[in-house]
């Protein structure tokens, strides 16, 4: 089975000059965990994910685990900074190292690319242009249907 058979063709994209707040709203409203970021002429320039947003809003989240008292004492300053961060452009935090898959690739190849690169979505490319997106969940569902009849 090929990527083109199950990819999502109507891709929700986010403009590269969108703010963190706008990107978070788009992801939440559409119940998706990430989206391609596009620049001029709808050119694919990156990917933004919940993980990117989480890291932007909570850059020192590891402090919570190592020293809760220190983290709590910083919370007031952190709240003020969060308001400023909401206005930052996603182009500052998006993943720029694009990992893509060709429209004619097999589902196994797409899944392997995701596993090796630890990503959960891949823009689907035909002749250098994005024509869709495929997620780990898309592949998992299809494989369950085929292999187990679920």
Regions found by a protein language model. Give the residues of each.
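N-terminal short leaders/motifs
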Residues: 46-52, 56, 78-79
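Gly/Ser-rich helix-loop-strand patches that form or flank binding pockets
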Residues: 117, 121, 136-147
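Hydrophobic alpha-helical segments with strong N-terminal bias
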Residues: 13, 53-54, 120
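Short hydrophobic beta-strand motif reused across regulatory alpha/beta modules
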Residues: 46-49, 133-139
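Short, basic and Ser/Thr-rich N-terminal targeting/leader segments
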Residues: 30-31, 118
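A short, polar/charged loop-to-alpha-helix boundary motif
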Residues: 54-70, 140-150
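Bateman/CBS regulatory modules and CBS-like beta-alpha motifs in cytosolic regions of diverse proteins
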Residues: 1-26, 32, 37-40, 44-45, ...
């Amino acid at each position: 089975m090929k990527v083109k058979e199950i990819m999502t063709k109507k891709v929700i994209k986010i403009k590269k000059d969108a703010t963190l707040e706008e990107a978070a709203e788009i992801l939440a409203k559409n119940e998706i965990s990430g989206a391609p970021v596009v620049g001029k002429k709808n050119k694919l320039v990156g990917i933004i994910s919940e993980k990117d947003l989480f890291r932007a809003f909570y850059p020192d989240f590891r402090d919570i685990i190592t020293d809760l008292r220190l983290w709590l004492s910083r919370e007031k300053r952190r709240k003020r900074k969060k308001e400023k961060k909401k206005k930052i452009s996603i182009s500052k935090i998006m993943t720029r190292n694009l990992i893509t898959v060709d429209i004619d690739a097999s589902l196994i190849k797409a899944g392997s690319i995701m596993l090796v690169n630890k990503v959960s979505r891949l823009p689907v490319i035909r002749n250098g242009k994005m024509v869709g997106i495929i997620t780990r969940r898309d592949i998992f569902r299809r494989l369950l249907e085929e292999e187990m009849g679920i």
